[in-house]
Curated annotation (Swiss-Prot):
May be involved in the modulation of rDNA transcription. WD repeats lie at residues 9-48, 71-108, 111-148. InterPro entries: G-protein_beta_WD-40_rep, WD40/YVTN_repeat-like_dom_sf, WD40_repeat_CS, WD40_repeat_dom_sf, WD40_rpt. This is Regulator of rDNA transcription protein 13. The gene is RRT13. Gene3D superfamilies: YVTN repeat-like/Quinoprotein amine dehydrogenase. It comes from the Eukaryota. Pfam families: WD40. Keywords: Repeat, Transcription, Transcription regulation, WD repeat.
């Protein structure tokens, strides 16, 4: 194992990371309310590059972020990535869909009346989010909420996966952890 870079910029804990294989970028989300993106193929595209001195780290290069995405008002805990979209979800109940190439904001979903978003699935067409007993399905072509369902009796939705009208949800019911398979056809 060899350390290649230290990616700097966040000012608080980092809660989610993604390596974008297609674009050769590292993406992270933090308690500091930001999403940061580093270009690992062309390091000159990033912010300041410095060299570690007198450091216990085996890495020599410290890279500043190429992009910093802002807009969430609280900890950003979840990230999702498709070919077209980078999606971020915050404990403030908001979801932001960014263009995966330009990082311009494409869609904003504000559900501040809900509790923290705990599950996220994104494809080029559909976004599914879950929180305490609630599933929301969005059409990412139109930016509209197309379905909102309460999972009766579910205390939490921990993870979701959606394909071809079938949703797999990891839920908690009465202190039991279960997988539920739901058909949306």
């Amino acid at each position: 194992m060899k350390c290649l870079y230290i990616l700097s910029g966040h000012t608080d804990r980092i809660y989610s990371t993604i390596y974008d294989h297609e674009r050769k970028r590292c993406i992270s989300a933090s308690m500091d309310t930001t999403i940061r993106i580093w270009d690992l193929e062309n390091i000159r595209n990033n912010g300041e590059c410095s060299y570690a001195t007198n450091s216990a780290s085996p890495c020599a290069k410290i890279l500043g972020a190429m992009y910093t995405l802002r807009g969430h008002r609280a900890l950003v805990g979840l990230l999702g990535l498709s070919d077209k979209f980078l999606v971020s979800a915050s404990v403030d109940g908001s979801i932001r869909c960014w263009d995966a190439n330009t990082y311009f904001l494409k869609h904003f979903f504000d559900h501040t009346q809900l509790n923290t978003i705990t599950a996220l699935h994104v494809s080029d067409e559909v976004l599914v989010s879950g929180s305490e007993g609630l599933l929301n399905i969005y059409d990412l072509n139109s930016g509209l909420l197309v379905r909102s369902d309460t999972l009766s009796g579910a205390d939490n939705v921990w993870n979701v996966s959606f394909k071809d009208n079938t949703l797999v949800a990891a839920v908690e019911r009465d202190k039991r952890n279960l997988l539920e398979i739901l058909d949306f056809s």
